């Protein structure tokens, strides 16, 4: 059952942070309901990542279809970009192997990638997982705030990440000056 706002009981429960309700709902919901996209372009998984609900993300990921795992919200986010933004390292680790190249390289409406967000949050292990999977264009991405993954990694003193990024970046991106 879907409300006139396009929500299921699960998306409402996730949105309200009702973890125990989600734990009961998830095993009892159909595949269609678990993968449902609401009127705001969010799935239960993207909402859970946005809310920082690690336990709910862990329950949802194995139940989600590949299409839902790779879903892009109306704001250009994926579950991966939202998990990186919230610093959910373990969720990023679960998502990366399940995601398509296109979804891993997704640029949000704010000009961020999962890599820039992981660097901003200081998630060194996630950066290490992402760099080999990202396109040159995504690695060189400049956010709407004027940062690259390299400037963000340098700011967080992530020396190993800087060393991994530099050989994969264009000279222009390496010489980019953050705003």
From Swiss-Prot:
<keyword id="KW-0677">Repeat</keyword>
<dbReference type="InterPro" id="IPR036770">
    <property type="entry name" value="Ankyrin_rpt-contain_sf"/>
</dbReference>
<dbReference type="GO" id="GO:0005737">
    <property type="term" value="C:cytoplasm"/>
</dbReference>
<feature type="repeat" description="ANK 2">
    <location>
        <begin position="40"/>
        <end position="72"/>
    </location>
</feature>
<protein>
    <recommendedName>
        <fullName>Putative ankyrin repeat protein RF_0922</fullName>
    </recommendedName>
</protein>
<dbReference type="InterPro" id="IPR051631">
    <property type="entry name" value="Ankyrin-KH/SAM_domain"/>
</dbReference>
<feature type="repeat" description="ANK 5">
    <location>
        <begin position="145"/>
        <end position="174"/>
    </location>
</feature>
<feature type="repeat" description="ANK 4">
    <location>
        <begin position="110"/>
        <end position="139"/>
    </location>
</feature>
<keyword id="KW-0040">ANK repeat</keyword>
<feature type="repeat" description="ANK 3">
    <location>
        <begin position="75"/>
        <end position="104"/>
    </location>
</feature>
<feature type="repeat" description="ANK 1">
    <location>
        <begin position="5"/>
        <end position="34"/>
    </location>
</feature>
<dbReference type="InterPro" id="IPR002110">
    <property type="entry name" value="Ankyrin_rpt"/>
</dbReference>
<dbReference type="Pfam" id="PF12796">
    <property type="entry name" value="Ank_2"/>
</dbReference>
